[in-house]
């Protein structure tokens, strides 16, 4: 099965930042859209719950929400926007500013690609 553009973008993110061990892209309801690599069972549901809770508690005026949480096994990073959320897992030594920068870069690329595709599909042949 061919990889989707979202899966390819997440694979690129893993190449861009060697600190990221896993990346998930979720829709606005918190359902899994794409992952790289395939997440362990149950992790996508937990990420979706985190995304929904972050939106309910912290979203203000459509601004993206950024959360990072450190635990013994590593760090969880979340960016939630009105359209999508991205969750990444890293080792504890990762620098949050760099991880968020790379995550935002890939989310921006995905948004541009979606806009270009919408224009392409919406264009009528002359």
Each language-model region and where it sits:
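Acidic, low-complexity cytosolic segments
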Residues: 1-22, 28-126
């Amino acid at each position: 099965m061919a990889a989707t553009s979202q899966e390819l973008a997440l694979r690129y993110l893993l190449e861009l930042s060697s600190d990221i061990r896993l990346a998930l892209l979720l829709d606005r309801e918190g359902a899994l859209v794409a992952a790289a690599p395939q997440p362990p069972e149950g992790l996508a549901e937990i990420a979706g719950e985190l995304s929904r809770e972050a939106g309910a508690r912290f979203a203000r005026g459509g601004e993206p929400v950024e959360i990072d949480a450190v635990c013994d096994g590593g760090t969880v990073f979340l960016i939630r926007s009105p359209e999508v959320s991205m969750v990444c897992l890293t080792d504890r030594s990762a620098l949050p500013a760099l991880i968020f920068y790379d995550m935002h870069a890939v989310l921006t690329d995905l948004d541009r690609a979606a806009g270009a595709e919408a224009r392409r599909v919406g264009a009528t042949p002359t």
